[in-house]
């Protein structure tokens, strides 16, 4: 199979956009050629992206697409011909347009074939569509690709001939090779060839790509360029790990991607900074190295920051001392700034900063951060009391939770909000759980993030998310479609995770009511607790499905809208165990039938009157329910939901016999009402743990 290589050589591309640009460039070219029939079955594409080039290698490329036999509907016969069988004006006009579109001179009416189209007899034209040749197809695909790239910001630059060109960065060369043959194509004022340039500093002169399959190897050997984005990234990772030795590299993927987009021939060098800077919280030092300098910090086996770091350079040299010293010199003022912020912030206790939160607007309809802190104290205090946590500690933590927003360090690095609050609270002599709550109350920050580790941190985190959810929703900013500017979906998930995973003996209604009460007197906030409750249950469904439970299992439990969620996993596991029983399907179907019967009746269902049980089957069912009921209730009280549901299996025979031999809606109203009462008792028993009718197919 033939291989097509396309490379666009440019000035340095935006680092944060490189991965996306590379993927889009390769995939768009592939899709464009495929749409024209220029790719064989099983064709594959490999993308390349470096700071100075976008490229794609496509295997299975045809020189020309195969011809296609096409059949196109023209017009219904009754419109195409008049009463005398002569062509009408609509037919003449249609044939002229069709001929023009397919490149034919004319199309004679007598050449058309007649056939039914499903509604009426119509005229059809058969013709052969010539397949596109590669040069034309590539030109179309390349132009479409360039026009459709996800470019963050377009530049306007001039070609040597004075023409203005718009692209993400100035483009200098274009390669288009089918195996070893140059395919003529042009874009951005460039014409295709087989010549490129290598590394800006480590390679001199032009490089000829001899064959499309030799692109990556030629660039690597002659140009000092690792063209593959993923290959280069893994090379950086390997070199970092090698240089770290026994230490651990702090290596977030986002930083690795950004550095990867800055180098074509990565080389890792170790550097140092003075130990005195280690007195500053390591989160500050790590963040300043990552954000400002794109350096990789190192920690020891205990997770403590080392006074050395790694840089990824685009220059390979046998005498790297100048590079190392230059980077050490550059990082020193950054670390000194962090130390200054830390020392200056410590001079003012967090508690003294709280009144200044009155100058920080949270939302113009809700008030300032100081007013918000007051609400957090009220909510956290109630929750702490309900859970048996330290109310005073919860209130103190809520008071201090937002104070670090006014510190110099958080002003410089907003990502450190909460983290710095913990350091400053410890310095001020606050209780350890109060200090930890300053950072823990933001948790979980994202899906899969750790939950707060302390009871104080948990209640303040719950209060923070409840206050945001109820307050922002209450001013009419509920999530809509893709818009969720206040991350209410994330806050809702955090609330649910804490209720379930901690677990917490709190009901959904009581925590929402506690939050709503804190907004009393604020006219702009109109909490819609019913809508928020629906929202929480919808998020709960998604959370449980992500945990691996089926839709039926989830609906069996969530459809009952349980208030407390601390036992919801046990209920789900019980439902799963019940569903595996041989009696489950029949009982689920019966429960569904009972539910439908009870929904349709408009009478008040009372208690069962044994003397009105006339049929053997209804007496047997009443006895079976009476026998099972204490066992189900005892198991439920113990939290043994699996046993509670499995006990229902003994009811199957009695339930089947009842529906086979008893007319529920009897003419005698006394008998009817008594049988409905019996079904009501059975329904209550069967749905004590979950609505098992949701398991019915």
UniProtKB/Swiss-Prot annotation:
GO terms for cellular component: cytosol. Its main location: cytoplasm. PROSITE patterns: AA_TRNA_LIGASE_II_GLYAB. InterPro entries: DALR_anticod-bd (IPR008909), Gly-tRNA-synth_bsu (IPR015944), Gly-tRNA-synth_heterodimer (IPR006194). It is found in: Cytoplasm. Keywords: Aminoacyl-tRNA synthetase, ATP-binding, Cytoplasm, Ligase, Nucleotide-binding, Protein biosynthesis. SUPFAM superfamilies: HD-domain/PDEase-like. SMART domains: DALR_1 (SM00836). GO terms for biological process: arginyl-tRNA aminoacylation; glycyl-tRNA aminoacylation. Its EC number is 6.1.1.14. One of its GO terms (molecular function) is arginine-tRNA ligase activity. It catalyses: tRNA(Gly) + glycine + ATP = glycyl-tRNA(Gly) + AMP + diphosphate. NCBIfam families: glyS. Belongs to the class-II aminoacyl-tRNA synthetase family. Tetramer of two alpha and two beta subunits. This is Glycine--tRNA ligase beta subunit. It comes from Ralstonia nicotianae (strain ATCC BAA-1114 / GMI1000). The lineage of its organism: Bacteria, Pseudomonadati, Pseudomonadota, Betaproteobacteria, Burkholderiales.
